[in-house]
């Protein structure tokens, strides 16, 4: 509910913003002749000033107006720099609207969005679930490959979030990341597998959509979650229901046997009834085995049936296609009424529904016949709907209802919509061919239409009559004569061509009319359409072969006209006919068979439904609508002959609960101990477990929550009750962890220790009944109290030690390490004496954390001599400029990178006043230029220094290098390795800092190279050549460490190269500046891999 309420509040905010935007637009009054064109510019400047204001109310008003502009489709991209500054605002309402804006424009303004990536990372830990989800949406909207590792880690973290709304957005981000980098597929499948186990209805639809996009072939991931998805289906949001139903349809076709076998078996039995072979009887007996539907198959059909009443047309259509594809034929009929109900929706929904009904009506006429009148055409229907309804009526036509339908069609022919009228005539022709009883009636009705005033109706009637006459040509000579008279009045090319073809095919039956028609056509040959010209040529050839005396000269005249026609098809057909019907010395053997070729009996055309071949596409899909396979279409598989093992869908609920709530699956040891508690404590425990189960879907990583992360997360939540509950859970988890690691004691000792630990935990907060029960099995009350006190101290010390070890372990696994921004925090433990060993250890840790004096900037290990071209002498008209990075601290500022530029005069004249101007720097970047050079002698050279603050990014610094006469546009783009300063530190400090920079602050990759490339000298030379880093002494021969800090922010950059077995090594980079770390990793990997 919380996720839904946040979603609705976000939509409500958008609506309010739209209203405010409209009010703001209406108040802008144009001033002067150009007010209409300057109002937008003035309004945007006003918004920028409001966003830079110190008042939150002004910023909030500005953001509402901006979001309103976006809602109305206006371009607000130029406000991106001003909006992104407020991404770290403390006002939650402003922050929400800023994230709404960033999701829209992050992909367009990638460079500016990358500058705020650290803010997005911090927002992933925000106490507000909407902010965490919005930060993930923005992060996944930045379509830059270098942040793929960051997105991957953020998705993993969000998939274990306590909020189902955040987990839902994690599922959405999976699809975006997969489209950006398909190589992450295996890691994303792990997250999908985890989210599929989620019990929240808010997450189910989104994760199934991610499953369909990333790994639709991994059916094994669905087995254990099949029944859960079926049971959750009714409560999932509407669009999630659509996705899940389509996926389960495909799943059912692979896991269950066909429910249609029973009907097929009956048909076979009817055939075998008349056969007397003994072998055939044995086969018949085998087929008589009754079909038993799988319970899981029945579960799916039963749970989707209520969704036929859904208000969402897509859900109803999804259920309908599911019933059509996987349910027994006797049960499909229940979808008819729901589909007919959808015909009251808008025209777009009607179009899709009618297309699917048209496909169904071909195979199951009886299912839709009771609703025949629902498909009658209305005058208000658009043409596309009318034609689809005609198609359905044609498919449903039979001897019983054809008279009613023909009266309906007679009305449709008179429609003002000519396209619809023509389609109706085609429908009448199809009815005439499929129902022999009304063939003559339809033909006579079509002949009457030949005298219609509308030329399109007459032309379509001619085409349909031509097809009907092909079936019974000998009986309709009078109709052909009547159609020949229409040649003078019909101008539609298709109709004229059809009449000529009919006369040509029946030229022997109308021997007096055919030559005269050819004479008329020869007069107008040059003005006819190409389709008509082809039929004139065919008519001439047929008459030449049957009535050569009357038509020989006329045919030769037509052939001469066709020989010089502009269309090459006409010329080609003319040459072909001439060689075939006019024999000469070069004529081949085919001339003898010309009459058989031209006057052969043609088969009658088949008037079929255009939806006949669409049944192999899944109903309701884009491929079915287009009648062609669309990109991303997943085909339905054939039913398996033998059902796969159904036990793969069995889920052992008890074992899952034990694994989810205990550190090492010790449920069997916990249950006996619980029996010693009083009834009141059992009630409290059950209430705690029930309250915790509400967030069970979010705590997929149970061990991390039990080892302390849940207490840190919950400390940021506004609910104090939730915080206390999670702390108590973490305390119990810590005690169980300490108990689990004390392996030196025997089984009975460990059980006694467990009882006393539980007693010491509950003695302060609950009644003394439980302690008295435990004391009855031991000695006196005083002895038990002293023993419990000493044991509690001992266990507390062991627990403190184990907690610190567990924290070091979880830092390697955790995705979002909160220690990056906070000092080392003490774990949550039971009350202990003031000077406990754990406190002393924590104080020592705090003292060690202030080690800034130990880490200091060092001199560079290596300075490459490689120079970069700043200005070529040809482009600079004789002035050439090169630059390189001396890897020294900049004298112009601590945050600037030092750059030395060498200027050369390659001309034979003096170049004067060399200076820099026209700086075009990205936001936040600064430049300290060199002093102007008065003159540079011919063939002279000079080296100058300058400093640029690149803001820890590899963005290009653009400026103009000018002389007295010219200005040249130049750029400096720093390699990522030159944005660092080498640092000297000990191995101990390196490991400590590295331990604090884990999770999202760590990127790694595997390197494969020849063994000779992994020697210490080669690795050192390659690393320091790419990056300005210092060498950290290492006590291990297979690990090489390098350290540096970024010039602008001073963030540590720790590089580790760890040699593995064989010819592989692991490259690890730890830094808060994750973008720079990813770029450095990408540059170091090919260098270390190559020989």
UniProtKB/Swiss-Prot annotation:
Record bears the keyword Membrane: yes
SMART domains, per database record: AP3B1_C (SM01355), B2-adapt-app_C (SM01020)
GO annotation, biological process: anterograde axonal transport; anterograde synaptic vesicle transport; intracellular protein transport; vesicle-mediated transport
Protein modification: Phosphorylated on serine residues. Pyrophosphorylation by 5-diphosphoinositol pentakisphosphate (5-IP7) impairs interaction with KIF3A. Serine pyrophosphorylation is achieved by Mg(2+)-dependent, but enzyme independent transfer of a beta-phosphate from a inositol pyrophosphate to a pre-phosphorylated serine residue.
Stored Gene3D superfamilies: Leucine-rich Repeat Variant (1.25.10.10)
Function: Subunit of non-clathrin- and clathrin-associated adaptor protein complex 3 (AP-3) that plays a role in protein sorting in the late-Golgi/trans-Golgi network (TGN) and/or endosomes. The AP complexes mediate both the recruitment of clathrin to membranes and the recognition of sorting signals within the cytosolic tails of transmembrane cargo molecules. AP-3 appears to be involved in the sorting of a subset of transmembrane proteins targeted to lysosomes and lysosome-related organelles.
Family in the record: Belongs to the adaptor complexes large subunit family.
Name this protein carries in UniProt: AP-3 complex subunit beta-1
Organism of origin: Canis lupus familiaris
Gene name of this polypeptide: AP3B1
